[in-house]
Amino acid sequence: MNRTVAATGLTLALLLQSPASAQLAGEPYIHDPSTITYSDGKYYTFGTGQGGLVSEDGWTWRSGGNRPGGGVAPDVIKIGDRYYVSYAVGGGGMSGGHASDVKIMWTKSLDPASPDFGYHEVGTVASSDGKENLDAIDPAFLYVDGRLWLSYGTYFGAIQMIELDPATGARKAGNKAVDIAIDMEATALLHRDGWYYLLGTHGTCCDGPNSTYHIRVGRSRDPLGPYVDHMGIPLLKGGGKMVVNARGRDIGPGHFGLIDLGEGVEKFSMHYEIDMNRGRSVLGIRPLLWKDGWPVAGDNIAEGTYEIEAERSGYALQLATDFVRVDFDARRSFFAPPGTPPVNVPDQTLAQVEPGWPNKAVSVDLGDYMVRPQQLWTVAPVPGAGGVMGAPYYKIVISGTQRTLAATATGEVEAVPAFTGAPEQLWRIDQLTDGTYRIMSKATPGTGEARALVAIGGTTPALVKFDPESPAGRWTFKKP
């Protein structure tokens, strides 16, 4: 947080030129966001200052929430019935100083309207005097196996780790801080498969389009380190593997926060120092993938035309229409004499086949991908339809038409003649941790339940409860 260059201290439109496709809706303006936390039916994140953001669905955000104490770069974690909030007062190179205190408080609700809302001070758990090689700001929690850890620090000195009492939030008696990294700030902590991951923000902040913020990571088998990157370089010597950098017109990602939605869906929050389309620091949410044991940023689906391929069978999602041959002299392939000039074979066009399609709802199945019009789907966000954590609801239509993928009351999918915006025509598309995608209906007619699109056998799609252990519900989107 707050290291200036000098002091070293979506609208709903998806940008085709930007791989990070979905900009959050509403007014997601924040700097140094805390880990997004669910409380009393809403999602909350808090930033530097006393304000924060609130959302009912994780897609449309507005100003809201209440966090007393001010200060910079808070973090939030829920343990039992308490929400612990850490924040720093002072430091960060502001007003030329690095003297700071990391403080803890707790509440039983983050909703100011709840009878359980009300903050209780725990006190100071870490400090820097402005003279030592330390700047005690940017705290981050990790709770694993009954133990509560807190990292903090900036470029001005080391990143340190301490242990807190999860029952009270206070620092454990006699606990000594341990240096675990340098050359980073705005750290975050993860635990996965026996590894502890330390993510830190590198680069310069707080200068909009000129900021070089980006997030790197190291890992250790012990929460106190040593942390090393994928090349074996210790984080205490400036190492760190890239997790996310600037993409498109979103510049300066920093302040990582894990959002584990379960069922193989992980995302992360951060701020961008600037969204060039809005001219301000904004909240960003991206899928989180895991590759060879390391976290890496994924991408929401960008608006465009795709082949949608089943991971189970390798077949493509398509209208169940009669097969129409491409005009072609097969003998030419086998028996053309030497020296015969090559002849371009044009793609089959929509105009050649659509007149033969029924003007009603058509079944959808899976088949060999052959670059046919009935296999090309245009995916686009639906303005005003809302969304889910970090992503909008999409419509999926046969390219060049209004024939729209829709859920049926019998747990099947079909293509209806026109898009109306009905819930059964809206789709949630989440990137899974392996890089494939889960496609879920917003609602199934008759039940209103969300169901996952899966491949039953080789050629039959259906809508059922998602099984994260099965490849049947995993899809890839490929450019034709």
Could you describe each region identified by the protein language model?
Residues 395-399, 403-404, 414-418, 425, ...:
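Cationic, beta-structured binding surfaces that engage anionic biopolymers and membranes
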Residues 198, 288, 312-337, 343-362, ...:
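A structural signal for the beta-strand cores of small, secreted beta-rich domains
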Residues 7-17:
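Bacterial N-terminal signal peptides
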Residues 205-207, 355-358, 404, 418-420, ...:
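Functionally engaged cysteine thiol sites
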